[in-house]
Structures are given as structure tokens and as C-alpha cells.
């Protein structure tokens, strides 16, 4: 199921801009103190490092991802999510000519 709306949040107004603008996100904090980020990845192939474990929820568009230690690219599209271990990394790619990948990153 795709998250369409998050109520009762505080938003960091200045965007986090990564990879020369290919990934842009905003941090949010829920009423209970839970932190997440919401963002978009434009067509590109990128590598992210994780501190805490993450769940990447796709709310629109699609991507392919590859977890550290794997050779397999897996597709993820709206309504789907994938988990990334903490202290790891993952590759993500959004194909040129396709809609940007819109996501919510849930930190564990």
C-alpha cells in the first residue's frame, strides 16, 4: 500500500540535495519523534551508504536497486518497498525517460 499523506509532522524546510541535484529530500519528524525523509530521485545511477537500517517506500515512479553483496537488480514501483541493512550501502537507478522515483525513507 502506498502512503499518500502523513499527518501531524514537522518538516525541515531546507532540502537535502545530493548527487548534483539527482536526489532531493526533506526530513520530517512525526508527533511521536519518529524521523523519516521524503524525496525524489531523478533519472540516474547512484550509490547510497546507510547508517541506520532503512525501508525505502515507493510512492510514485519506479527504480531498480541492488543491495550490497548482491549482483541482482530488483525493480520497485509504486506501492512497493525494500529494506536496506544499517551500516551498508545500496545502488539505485532510475531509467532515463521515466518518471522520477518518489519515496519515503523510513529509518529503523
UniProtKB/Swiss-Prot annotation:
Top class in the EC scheme: transferase
Record keywords, A-Z: Glycosyltransferase, Transferase
Function: Catalyzes the phosphorolysis of diverse nucleosides, yielding D-ribose 1-phosphate and the respective free bases. Can use uridine, adenosine, guanosine, cytidine, thymidine, inosine and xanthosine as substrates. Also catalyzes the reverse reactions.
Domain of life: Bacteria
Signal peptide positions on this chain: none
Protein name: Pyrimidine/purine nucleoside phosphorylase
Cellular component aspect of the GO annotation: cytosol
Organism: Polaromonas naphthalenivorans (strain CJ2)
Coiled-coil regions listed: none
Record's catalysed reaction(s): a purine D-ribonucleoside + phosphate = a purine nucleobase + alpha-D-ribose 1-phosphate; adenosine + phosphate = alpha-D-ribose 1-phosphate + adenine; cytidine + phosphate = cytosine + alpha-D-ribose 1-phosphate; guanosine + phosphate = alpha-D-ribose 1-phosphate + guanine
Gene Ontology terms, MF aspect: guanosine phosphorylase activity; purine-nucleoside phosphorylase activity; thymidine phosphorylase activity; uridine phosphorylase activity
Enzyme Commission no: 2.4.2.1, 2.4.2.2
Family per record: Belongs to the nucleoside phosphorylase PpnP family.
